[in-house]
Amino acid sequence: MHMKTVRQERLKSIVRILERSKEPVSGAQLAEELSVSRQVIVQDIAYLRSLGYNIVATPRGYVLAGGKSGVSRLVAVKHAPEEIKEELLCVVRNGGRIVDVIVEHPVYGEIRGIIDVSSEEEVLKFVNLMEMAKTEPLLTLSGGVHLHTIEAPDEETMERIMRELKKKGFLIEEG
């Protein structure tokens, strides 16, 4: 088979695998399944992104963003670093997913980090990873003020999440 055709088939396979997967797919999994190196997968993902595929690298692997059913909302919140776990649990216990965290930086502008948690287990793993890495969370760059993209299966679930964030004093409201 011609080199170009082999790559095109592999690219189609990557998109198909990501479309069908309900969970993030690691580069190592893709490499093994497609019998190529991890580096080839990294290059293929970069190429697919250049073609317009919205492939996001999360701590647990690649996901093809968009096309999900449900509602998504960008939410402004403020809290101390030690309240991260409580904030994330507040969202997942009410049926939501925290996609990312976004902070404003005076020099760099917007800085975005992928969180991608939707269960208590994932929240605990994420918080544990932050503690083990001994790194400052992004919210420390902006005095605790930050944004999250939150996804929920429906508007009713999203409203429940918003009420809970407000009740805990995390939600920044207009006015």
Swiss-Prot record:
- Provide the cofactor list for this protein: Ni(2+)
The cofactor note reads: Binds 1 Ni(2+) ion per monomer; it is not certain this is the physiological metal.
Q: Which residues bind Ni(2+)?
A: 79, 87, 146, 148
User: Which Pfam families does UniProt cross-reference here?
Assistant: 3H (PF02829), HTH_11 (PF08279)
What are the protein's GO molecular function terms?
DNA binding; metal ion binding
Key words of the record: DNA-binding, Metal-binding, Nickel, Repressor, Transcription, Transcription regulation
Function summary = Probably functions to regulate transcription of NAD metabolic genes. Binds to DNA upstream of the probable nadBII/nadA/nadC and niaRP operons in a nicotinic acid dependent fashion. Nicotinic acid may be a corepressor.
Q: Quaternary state and partners of this protein?
A: Homodimer.
Protein name (record): Probable transcription repressor NiaR
